[in-house]
């Protein structure tokens, strides 16, 4: 009996040592809902996480260095759920970090099967789930600024927003505040809201852009991933304007793109990864960052912006941006 107890004690001690070793070693996965090379947003996501992990690993012993895995899921949204499920099923990632407004609704059902999995989701909003922390960029500001310059530049006073799909941030913030900004610039402005149905179909994006152009729309905001390239092609062919979201897009079509509102995705992905590795992630919370915090900006110094947009309109944009940054104007 004593031998059995001794063996059991040794076995438990051995197992606990193994578990302690596993507990001391963290593993991070980055889920890219798209293609890294095709998306500055996802490239910044990956670079920020990498930087935080590499920085932390410099202070860790080899056996405790953090493992980093990057899954490039592609643009077919129907495959995102199964691929996230596969990551969760491996049960080895302490956190899965990603970025897309549609992801909270996608991961919540998956968490019913994998209740211990943690997610940090950027460019998204979700409160109240202990397994999820989200950070969104102030898209009230982004959308309003984009709509404001669109309203100033439009000669027909007809604008369009072409989205990949409908989701809460799109329906409740981006679309209404894009319209609000356009009407603030010119009360006669109208916004035609169209849906592609996915994040990759450039042909359909072009078809929708052609259709709204025929109705007199002369400024389009595309938020549809890879389908945005089709919208740009159509805009160039129809000699109308594009307002751009999330990164500096002026080089994509000089003379056609009139604005770029940018978000500091690399800096934010670095911050949330570092926060997680330090055990400081505020789970179940949703954070918003904007112009005052230095995570949202409106590009004013690009040569193509200066060349394409008249000086009087650039001055109006500069004044509005300065007022927001100083707290004189709050967009909400």
Task: Identify the meaning behind each predicted range.
Residues 1-27:
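Short, low-complexity disordered leader/linker segments with a strong preference
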Residues 21-332:
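A residue-level marker of the well-folded mature domains of exported/periplasmic proteins
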């Amino acid at each position: 009996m004593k031998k059995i107890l001794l063996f059991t004690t040794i076995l438990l001690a051995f197992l606990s040592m193994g578990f302690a070793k596993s507990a001391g070693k963290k593993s991070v996965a980055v889920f890219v809902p798209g293609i890294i090379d095709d998306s500055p947003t996802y490239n910044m996501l990956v670079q920020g996480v990498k930087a935080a992990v590499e920085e932390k690993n410099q202070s860790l012993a080899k056996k405790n260095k953090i493992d980093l895995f990057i899954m490039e899921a592609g643009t077919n949204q129907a495959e995102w759920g199964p691929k996230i499920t596969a990551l969760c099923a491996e049960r080895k990632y302490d956190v899965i970090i990603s970025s897309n407004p549609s992801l909270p609704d996608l991961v919540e059902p998956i968490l019913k099967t994998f209740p211990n999995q943690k997610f940090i989701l950027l460019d998204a909003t979700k409160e109240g789930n202990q397994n999820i922390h989200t950070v969104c960029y102030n898209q009230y500001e982004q959308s309003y600024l984009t709509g404001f310059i669109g309203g100033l530049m439009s000669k027909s006073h007809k604008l369009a927003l072409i989205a990949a799909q409908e989701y809460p941030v799109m329906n409740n913030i981006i679309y209404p505040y894009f319209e609000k900004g356009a009407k603030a610039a010119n009360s006669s402005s109208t916004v035609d809201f169209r849906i592609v149905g996915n994040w990759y179909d450039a042909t359909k994006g072009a078809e929708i852009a052609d259709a709204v152009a025929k109705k007199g729309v002369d400024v389009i905001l595309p938020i549809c991933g890879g389908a945005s390239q089709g919208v740009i092609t159509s805009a160039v062919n129809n000699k109308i304007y594009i307002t751009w979201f999330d990164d500096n897009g002026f080089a994509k079509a000089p003379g056609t793109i009139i604005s770029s509102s940018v978000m500091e995705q690399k800096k934010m992905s670095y911050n949330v990864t570092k926060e997680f590795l330090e055990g400081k992630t505020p789970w179940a919370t949703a954070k918003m960052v904007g112009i005052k915090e230095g995570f949202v900006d409106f590009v004013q110094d690009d040569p193509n912006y200066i060349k394409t947009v008249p000086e009087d309109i650039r001055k109006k944009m500069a004044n509005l941006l300065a007022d927001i940054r100083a707290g004189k104007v709050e967009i909400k």
